[in-house]
């Protein structure tokens, strides 16, 4: 992977203890950034931060992104560790169970919305004022190809990720005058812990939709995100970057 220069930049990665979030955090560290990992799993996020500490300056914060007060407290903790927040990666999310919409448990629907889109809103609402004050920022929201196309048996997940795309487009326009770039990625499925929440039938459905014939590698997602966070991305904002292996070509 090409090296991206993020020296002297500070970054927050939600859901940074594992999966795509971990790969992003690791590449940002390797690129010179100081990184704060936000995750609801206290044990795992602390273990991950310890493991990454040899690569650079990294901290762990336990946070529930679906709770606005928890996010506000996370910002307070993070600002004690590093000066400001230049980069925000909204990656935390869950897939939820696979079921037809008419059979979908309302409590699971609400939980998915609370984490996948309300969590993004809470982080954006809390962090963007810091970036506005500094007249600089790079925000990348992690959506999904499901948010563009909709996956059967995953209406809640698909709807929540479509909302992430929409909030990216709106906020990109709102922050364009503040030297803040807001973009999102729409990855196809990658082999991460989120697969544990899915039926094998659904996993095979997703694989069968990818013309490349394989799942996304988390390092491939991290590479695109790192570029979006860099000074090289000086113009593009409010955009959707596809990582679906040819499934979605718009």
Predicted regions and their residues:
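Short C-terminal tail/terminal secondary-structure segment
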Residues: 2-5, 95-98, 149, 237-250
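Canonical Rossmann dinucleotide-binding motif of NAD(H)/NADP(H)-dependent dehydrogenases/reductases
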Residues: 4-36
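C-terminal substrate-recognition "lid" of short-chain dehydrogenase/reductases
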Residues: 82, 124, 132, 136, ...
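Substrate-binding pocket helix/loop in short-chain dehydrogenase/reductase
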Residues: 99-101, 108-110, 195, 206
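Active-site helix of classical SDR
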Residues: 124, 160, 168
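Alpha-helical segment proximal to the catalytic Tyr-Lys
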Residues: 129, 173-177, 234
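Residue(s) in the substrate-gating loop at a strand-loop-helix junction
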Residues: 144
